[in-house]
């Protein structure tokens, strides 16, 4: 996202968002992606164009309804839902969650028709033992079914990714695993080996503060500059400096970073790049350290668990468009685009659980120059329903199927965790971060493409490995994510913007989102949701205001 | 020389060329087919070439008995070569599995083609000789065209015809070429021919026959491939899940699922008695029994030999399979109409999903799934699946699992044993010899002790105390070995199974 993206005024934003919903290229797709997240089923399903137009009217509308609530959470992605989850655990019930779209979940959104399939995030690596809150959450929800005599978690075997998990299509043949190992030179093979052992060394490395050099949550990582200085160069530069020049290795690292961050090897900082390989320290009684948890609906499964006890606190189809402090409280203007009515919330505490890039629009009175450092990568996700097809030579159809030097990131077989012998339709989820140009340009390009164009782009890529796949395809749905992931570019993670952005405003408006970590993964969203809940809970119980009435109901 | 006789050499020399090409192609097709169908390509090619050349010699020898009506004879021979050569490969493909003496038919057809081809050239030379050409010229021209044709054939055959047309179509194609030569000569010299009407009739018949063969050669091929079963197919159906094929030879009926032999009526009693009865001798008052797989009803037939058994639930995904074994008279005779017993409840459901939601407890569970040759089936042999079974098994109940061959795939077999143990079962591995399968293994499992509660039924044909005692002994070449536990997230059993069967297939 360029500087121009954030320099428009709130009034312009409101005016332009109508156009944005009609397919503007202003990079506001996350906000406007409510119904405009272009779901295509053989055609481009039209966005809810009316919202934008009516939004302009909203400002002139009289306030239809005024609400008083103690806490308001804006956004029902993982961070917002997690905040609510921990509020509930602390016995706090006087809160509401507002969601712009008509469904909840953010990047954990999933689709459900004949099959269930993810629209974005689709797995969780088994977490490190240090990630106590997440481990507790998983245990509470029976994804961890118990602990063995060494206190290692025992995971639900239906959630651990079934074998075969990964395969890579190289020169007409599917090899097992994603690290290229077929048809490569000895020298290249050696480099890959050295690279991986170097990453393993980083995995166990600690800084002078005795903290892990790289860990998840990212906030627990060491601030030792011998590691954090790696944030000042790109992963590509770091690899070149360390004589890691082999082409297959560069392909592999680039692939991994695109997959997790939506940024290329040249854009990702070396710290973030190494973090990908070195931060996961999962341990389990019944799984390998690098095993992952996955479900047909991807992280939608986890999202439902976080949300399940608070569904009556969530209001969808609500656009919060103005947040300001008034008389010691916070006033939040909300547009209900379903009923086309304007609402106002007067609340004690606000949990901001949407991307930072929206701050200048919703809180124009606040100084937020640092927001320009928050940039987001656009993605295209295709969900493809097929009849069984010839899966090619070599390793059998796997969970993750990647084409070497392919155009996208390959596809995940979303029905991989199904137990049935009888799988007459398959669901492939195909991922592609849009990284040919800068994110703003890519968003412009993406929004004008037709379903036919996306379809042929996806098919061209898949046909490299499955020449006859088209005959077996029943349906291709496409969804565009304007601002899918925060980009851990050079200097971002250990720069000042991320720290500035995390500061609460007057102890009344608090921030929680994975973009505050610089890494768009479930664990970080969960961490920020949990952290912000702690702050709010402490304010509620120990603040000077009278909250005696708080337990309500 | 008149006007016509000047044309003779050109047309006939062209015939020599085509005849030589076709002749060599038939030889190559025969060699390829023989090594393809019977293996051992060195012997097959060697025998075919020798036999073919020898037959040509016989043909040449016989040519001296032809004195009159040489052109008639030439056309006649040409048509015969076209017919026999053209249909040889499809005949061989089709009969391959249905006759015992395949190679004699192969050699017979080769000899016949060789004899006809051997006649062609000498006959042509005689014809040319009578047209007052110099002997030297005839020899030189005929053999030149003969050898050029041979070279062309041997180059085009592997590079163009086999890859582009396949053996059957190539065969028809050259048969048609032979017939066209005959037709051309027939047309041009009709006036000189004595039997022209008969020859015309024959030529057109052969031409139409070969052309039809050429057009429908794909159908012939697929039909021929369907006969790669050893015996006569008496039933074939593709259900949504598998290809069901029944064959019969004499009184022996075999069932194939996706080309894998499931049973042979000749010795299936061994397999099914061994599957069912040891389990029952250890089960205290078996009333409710669950069978997973086993849609053929043979295991049910064995179970119905126990009066204590009151209810049998059979879970088999494929309704086509269970319906077949409930309705087909020949098959209900085999399973003694077991699937129509009022004690039996058939559920055409997915075993894993059914087990996960099932709340009923069973006294005995019989698991008769196909071998774990793919990842979908591998799930049904996982520790997770066996753990689910413990929720469906009465506290004192027993399970038996068909566990592939401990001789062919010892690691796979012992992996099933280990996986059962890993979820808290005590196991009792045993194996029996089933001639159609080989040495076959089973594993009994229980959370209790194995204590015998009843005797084997008396009327069994195979299983008794002595046979069971013997079946518990594993000789050195199939002795227990260390393996990993088969889990959903490693599917190690499928890997073992593939490695071990790859060695012997």
Language-model segments: what does each one mean?
Chain A
Residues 37-60, 171, 177-179, 183, ...:
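Conserved flavin/dinucleotide-binding core of flavoenzymes
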Residues 69-96:
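N-terminal Rossmann-like FAD-binding beta1-loop-alpha1 element of flavoenzymes
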Residues 316-427, 465:
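Mid-domain catalytic core of redox enzymes
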């Amino acid at each position: 996202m360029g500087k121009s993206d954030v320099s428009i005024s709130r009034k312009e934003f409101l005016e332009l968002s109508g156009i944005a919903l009609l397919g503007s290229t202003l990079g506001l797709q996350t906000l406007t992606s409510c119904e405009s997240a272009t779901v295509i089923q053989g055609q481009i399903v039209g966005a809810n164009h009316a919202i934008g137009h009516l939004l302009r009217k909203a400002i002139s509308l009289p306030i239809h309804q005024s609400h008083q609530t103690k806490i308001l959470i804006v956004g029902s992605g993982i961070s917002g839902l997690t905040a609510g989850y921990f509020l509930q655990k602390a016995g706090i019930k006087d809160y509401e969650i507002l969601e712009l779209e008509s469904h909840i979940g953010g990047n954990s959104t999933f689709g459900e028709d004949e099959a269930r399939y993810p629209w974005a995030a689709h797995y969780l690596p088994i977490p490190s033992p240090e990630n106590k809150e997440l481990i507790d959450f998983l245990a509470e929800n029976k994804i961890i079914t118990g602990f063995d005599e060494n206190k290692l978690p025992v995971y639900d075997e239906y959630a651990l990714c079934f074998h075969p998990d990964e395969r890579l299509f190289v020169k007409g043949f599917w090899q097992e695993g994603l690290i290229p190992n077929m048809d490569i030179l000895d020298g290249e093979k050696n480099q890959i080996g050295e690279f991986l052992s170097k990453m393993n060394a980083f995995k166990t490395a600690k800084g002078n503060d005795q903290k892990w050099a790289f860990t998840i949550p990212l906030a627990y990582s060491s601030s030792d500059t011998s590691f954090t200085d790696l944030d000042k160069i790109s992963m590509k530069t770091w690899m070149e400096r360390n004589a890691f020049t082999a082409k297959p290795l560069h392909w592999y690292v680039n692939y991994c970073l695109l997959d997790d961050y939506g940024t290329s090897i040249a854009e990702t900082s070396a710290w973030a790049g190494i973090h990908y390989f070195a931060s996961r320290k999962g341990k389990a009684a019944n799984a390998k350290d690098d095993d992952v948890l996955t479900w047909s609906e991807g992280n939608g499964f986890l999202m439902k668990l976080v949300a399940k006890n608070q569904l009556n606190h969530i209001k969808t189809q609500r656009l919060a468009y103005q947040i300001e402090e008034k008389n010691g409280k916070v006033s939040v203007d909300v547009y209900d685009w379903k009923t086309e009515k304007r609402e106002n919330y007067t609340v004690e505490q606000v949990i901001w659980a949407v991307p930072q890039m929206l701050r200048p629009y919703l809180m124009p009175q606040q100084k937020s120059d640092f927001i320009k450092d928050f940039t987001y990568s656009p993605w295209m996700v295709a969900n493809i329903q097929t009849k069984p097809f010839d899966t090619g030579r070599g390793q059998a159809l796997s969970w993750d199927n990647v084409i070497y030097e392919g155009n996208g990131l390959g596809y995940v077989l979303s029905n991989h965790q199904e137990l049935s012998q009888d799988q007459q339709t398959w669901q492939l989820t195909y991922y592609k971060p849009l990284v040919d140009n800068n994110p703003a340009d890519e968003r412009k390009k993406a929004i004008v493409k037709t379903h036919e164009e996306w379809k042929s782009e996806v098919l061209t890529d898949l046909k490299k490995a499955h020449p006859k796949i088209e005959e077996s395809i029943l349906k291709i749905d496409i969804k565009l994510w304007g601002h899918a992931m925060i980009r851990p570019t050079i200097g971002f993670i250990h720069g000042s913007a991320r720290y500035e952005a995390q500061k609460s405003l007057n102890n009344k408006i608090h921030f929680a989102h994975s973009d505050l970590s610089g890494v768009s993964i479930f664990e970080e969203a969960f961490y920020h949701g949990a952290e912000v809940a702690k702050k709010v809970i402490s304010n509620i119980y120990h603040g000077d205001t009278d909250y005696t009435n708080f337990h309500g109901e | 020389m008149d006007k016509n006789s000047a044309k003779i050499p050109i047309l006939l020399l062209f015939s020599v060329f085509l005849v030589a090409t076709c002749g060599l192609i038939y030889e190559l097709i025969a060699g390829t087919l023989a090594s393809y169908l019977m293996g051992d390509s060195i012997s097959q090619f060697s025998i075919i070439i020798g036999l073919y050349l020898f037959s040509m010699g016989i043909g040449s020898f016989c040519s001296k008995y032809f004195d009159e009506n040489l052109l008639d004879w030439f056309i006649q021979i040409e048509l015969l070569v076209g017919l026999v050569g053209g249909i040889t490969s499809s005949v061989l493909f089709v009969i391959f599995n249905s006759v015992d003496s395949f190679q004699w038919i192969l050699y017979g057809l080769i000899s016949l083609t060789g004899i006809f081809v051997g006649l062609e050239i000498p006959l042509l030379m005689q014809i040319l000789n009578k047209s007052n050409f110099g002997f030297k010229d005839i020899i030189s021209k005929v053999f030149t065209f003969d050898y050029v044709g041979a070279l062309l054939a041997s180059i085009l055959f592997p590079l163009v015809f086999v890859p582009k047309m396949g053996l059957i179509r190539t065969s028809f194609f050259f048969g048609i070429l032979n017939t066209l030569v005959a037709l051309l000569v027939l047309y041009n010299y009709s006036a000189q021919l004595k039997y022209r009407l008969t020859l015309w009739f024959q030529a057109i018949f052969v031409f139409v026959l070969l052309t039809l063969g050429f057009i429908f050669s794909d159908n012939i091929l697929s039909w021929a491939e369907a006969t790669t079963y050893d015996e006569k197919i008496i039933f074939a159906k593709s259900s949504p899940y598998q290809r069901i094929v029944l064959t019969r030879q004499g009184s022996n009926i075999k069932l194939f699922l996706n080309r894998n032999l499931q049973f042979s009526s000749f010795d299936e009693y061994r397999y099914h008695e061994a599957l069912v009865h040891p389990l029952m001798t250890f089960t205290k008052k078996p009333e409710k029994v669950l069978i997973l797989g086993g849609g053929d009803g043979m295991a049910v037939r064995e179970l119905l030999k126990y009066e204590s058994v009151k209810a049998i639930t059979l879970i088999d995904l494929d309704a086509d399979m269970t319906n077949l074994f409930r309705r087909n008279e020949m098959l209900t005779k085999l399973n003694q109409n077991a699937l129509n017993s009022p004690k039996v409840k058939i559920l055409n459901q997915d075993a894993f999903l059914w087990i996960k939601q099932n709340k009923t407890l069973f006294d005995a569970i019989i698991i008769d799934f196909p071998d774990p040759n793919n990842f979908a089936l591998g799930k049904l042999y996982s520790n997770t699946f066996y753990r689910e079974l413990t929720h469906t098994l009465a506290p004192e109940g027993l399970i038996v699992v068909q566990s592939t061959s401990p001789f062919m795939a010892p690691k796979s077999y012992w992996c099933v044993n280990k996986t059962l143990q890993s979820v808290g079962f005590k196991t009792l591995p045993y194996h029996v010899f089933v001639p159609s399968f080989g040495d076959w293994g089973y594993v009994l499992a229980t959370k209790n002790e194995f204590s015998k509660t009843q005797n084997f039924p008396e009327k069994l044909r195979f299983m008794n105390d002595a046979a069971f005692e013997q079946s518990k002994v594993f000789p050195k070449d199939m002795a227990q070995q260390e393996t990993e536990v088969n889990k959903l997230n490693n599917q190690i059993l499928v890997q073992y199974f593939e490695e071990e069967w790859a060695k012997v297939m």
